[in-house]
Regions:
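Glycine-rich repeat segments that build the extracellular carbohydrate-interaction surface of secreted
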Residues: 1-20, 37-46
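Residues within well-ordered beta-strands of beta-sheet-rich folds
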Residues: 8-12, 39-43, 90-95, 123, ...
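Predominantly extracellular beta-rich ligand-binding scaffolds that present long acidic/polar faces
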Residues: 19-31, 35-38, 53-56, 110-116, ...
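Right-handed parallel beta-helix/beta-spiral solenoid domain characteristic of secreted/periplasmic
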Residues: 35-105, 131-133, 164, 300
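Short, small/polar residue-rich loop motifs at catalytic or cofactor-binding pockets
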Residues: 354-356
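Short, acidic, Ser/Thr-enriched surface-loop or helix-capping motifs
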Residues: 363
Length: 383
């Protein structure tokens, strides 16, 4: 542990198999004085290997950690990577590729955060998770991209695409009370859980906090399907969720624990319902269509059901839409920050500290918002 703690590993572009035969990689420590922090930084020009750390371009030089197509990784909980106790693993500029097709009945997820002591942390910055598949599970063990049992997952500028579980979390699932999922400037699209509940995210427990996140709902077939779902404590700020067909329970449901939404957009897309009435408090300035009556709207929220919004498509990595005169209440930067802090005295402040207050004054693309007139959702046209 002492030899690796604080180390940074620089990885050139290329495809690296870390799930072979019946095993992925498990990292776990015990008896050390703290979490062992290891950083893996990708995106380097292979020609500079061993000589030059300035030749880095994540968009041009893809560092991919992949599953061998014959591997089910059964020895590591059907996961490419498992994080156990006393770990703080940071990936920057990396791609995780399960190499499954959506029609496959696969078994392997990307990352399982499963510290028995709850002291595991996964940090992803400027990363992509794609083509993982839990289609062979029974419907209760989803989270094809990330499953959080105990620990913290911090996702900044992460794209999750084309991941699949049978049910409960096509991309992400959380299961324990001490699961913490923080997301900033993230995009989730084309993730599937066709039979039940969270087609993109199923948070059964713990805390889920989002800022500047776009989730495009994907078609499902189950009668209880919904895009983002669970009994966790949710906090959604500056976030966009767009529905699709086959999700009759809408785009967002917070079923049990007290949750908060502020300055977010809930669009029905090809579906016919957005917010499922549950334990939700509005922090104001949300724009929504076809929500359940009594979901918790306040005077500064806007029912946008009379307006037509664009189809569920991405432009410059976000769902873009145009504000009409129906909306006459707009959030300020400070109002959003205050709402986030009010969500939970401890977790709300932790999330603000992690994002940084300035992060609530830009949109998902990094475009500057008008701090006195902010557009709802992850996209801001600069009103």
């Amino acid at each position: 542990a002492a030899k690796l703690d604080g180390k940074k590993i620089y990885v050139a572009a290329g495809s690296y198999e870390i799930a072979k035969e019946n095993s992925g990689v498990k990292i776990e420590y015990s008896g050390y004085s703290k979490q062992v922090e290891i950083t893996i930084e990708g995106g380097y020009n292979p020609l500079s290997t061993g000589t030059d750390l300035t030749k880095r371009d994540v968009a041009k030089y893809t560092t991919a950690f992949v599953r061998n197509t014959s591997s089910g990784a059964s020895a590591t909980s059907n996961s490419l990577l498992v994080l156990g106790n006393q770990t703080n693993i940071i990936f920057d500029g990396c791609t995780f590729n399960g190499q499954y097709g959506l029609s496959d009945a696969g078994s392997v997820r990307a990352v399982f955060v499963a510290a028995g002591g709850g002291d595991a942390t996964l940090q992803l910055n400027n990363c992509v998770i794609k083509n993982f598949n839990r289609g062979s599970d029974g419907g209760s063990d989803g989270g094809a991209a990330v499953k959080v049992s105990k620990g913290r997952v911090l996702l900044n500028q992460v794209e999750m695409v084309s991941n699949k579980a049978t049910g409960r979390g096509g991309a992400i699932t959380t299961t324990a009370a001490n699961s913490f999922l923080f997301m900033n400037n993230c995009l989730l699209h084309e993730n599937y859980a066709p039979t039940a509940w969270g087609t993109s995210i199923h948070a059964g427990n713990g805390y889920v906090c989002m800022n500047n996140v776009t989730v495009l709902g994907t078609a499902a077939t189950g009668g209880n399907s919904i895009t983002v779902n669970g009994d966790a404590y949710f906090m959604l700020a500056n976030t966009t969720i767009v529905g699709n067909s086959g999700n009759p329970n809408g785009v967002f449901r917070a079923g049990k624990n007290a949750s908060l939404v502020v300055n977010s957009l809930f669009a029905k897309g090809a579906g016919n319902r957005t917010i499922y009435a549950g334990n939700i408090t509005s922090g104001g300035y949300n724009v929504y269509q076809a929500a359940d009556a009594g979901w918790g709207a306040v005077a500064t929220d806007t029912d946008y059901s009379s307006q037509t919004l664009p189809a569920a498509t991405l432009t410059d990595g976000v769902y873009q839409w145009t504000v009409t005169g129906v909306i006459d209440e707009f959030a300020t930067w400070q109002a959003v920050i205050n709402a986030v802090k009010s969500f939970d005295a401890t977790v709300g402040q932790q999330f603000v500290d992690w994002v940084g207050e300035a992060g609530f004054g830009v949109d998902q693309r990094g475009a500057t918002r008008n701090v006195n007139k902010m557009q709802a959702g992850a996209y801001d046209a600069g009103l």
